[in-house]
Amino acid sequence: MEEGERSPLLSQETAGQKPLSVHRPPTSGCLGPVPREDQAEAWGCSCCPPETKHQALSGTPKKGPAPSLSPGSSCVKYLIFLSNFPFSLLGLLALAIGLWGLAVKGSLGSDLGGPLPTDPMLGLALGGLVVSAASLAGCLGALCENTCLLRGFSGGILAFLVLEAVAGALVVALWGPLQDSLEHTLRVAIAHYQDDPDLRFLLDQVQLGLRCCGAASYQDWQQNLYFNCSSPGVQACSLPASCCIDPREDGASVNDQCGFGVLRLDADAAQRVVYLEGCGPPLRRWLRANLAASGGYAIAVVLLQGAELLLAARLLGALAARSGAAYGPGAHGEDRAGPQSPSPGAPPAAKPARG
């Protein structure tokens, strides 16, 4: 058949029909490739706004803005942000102080693997990092309504609660052995008094606060290489200034030599200058006296974390309900659409038989 004969047939077949158009995949306003639906909806971690993400996945046009949260859910959202913001600042401050302390000790040539089981500055830095990370996740997750960050925040709070429960159970079960190990810990700190500036600061604060000297008695300082009477240095047979009854000696600054030569004196002469009682018994008495207050603080922290966990769960539920209401079945007009006219090429529908 010639070309001229085929043209009328083609025009008759296509008469009354809309011209065919090439189907193009839907695009979104977000940068990067369109995410898979199962990956994008799994954790709510997409960088796109919810309505834009759903348009990119389904190809449906935008019908309107996403519904806003209810007043109660909005209150929960800002309550999570405001309650975590101070902890974020405190965590970042602790992290900065810990890193600064580690940098100073490194510049002084100090060994980070010192006599303490964990370096105080390293513990401060790690604690600040964990607290600031969890608090910032709660702040940003609530403020930006990001379910991924809110789930991470909830997981962190839950991990804190589990660790605190385990630590509390261990303290209750091992309370007696922990008290018995105090004097041993103090003797280790005395032997390494000059090795670590943080250790020296902590031991000085314990002796000044409890008005004591040594572990069991002031003679425990004989275990220190610098204060031992056999030492050739100028500190031989001496005690640190934190053992002195009046370290300032009515002056403006601490007299570091107030305890020099005290270990050569008898007990009657030494008690006029330094404290003779060790820090083990006063430390045990202090722990027993403050046990109720420490337990109250621990319970308050646990209750606060439990409240944060419940608020995060409430906000996650509200966000999930809003997403389901906005993008569930019938939200885009599929179920609300009226009857559609049949296509020109479709066969006519059969009429019901009359009785």
From Swiss-Prot:
Disulfides per UniProt: C212-C279, C213-C243, C229-C237, C244-C258
Pfam families attached to this UniProt entry: Tetraspanin
Cellular location(s): Cell membrane
Alphabetical UniProt keywords: Cell membrane, Disulfide bond, Glycoprotein, Membrane, Transmembrane, Transmembrane helix
Entries under PANTHER family matching the protein: TETRASPANIN, TETRASPANIN-10
Subunit structure: Interacts with ADAM10.
Protein name, entry field: Tetraspanin-10
Organism: Homo sapiens (Human)
Lineage of origin: Eukaryota, Metazoa, Chordata, Craniata, Vertebrata
Gene name for this UniProt entry: TSPAN10
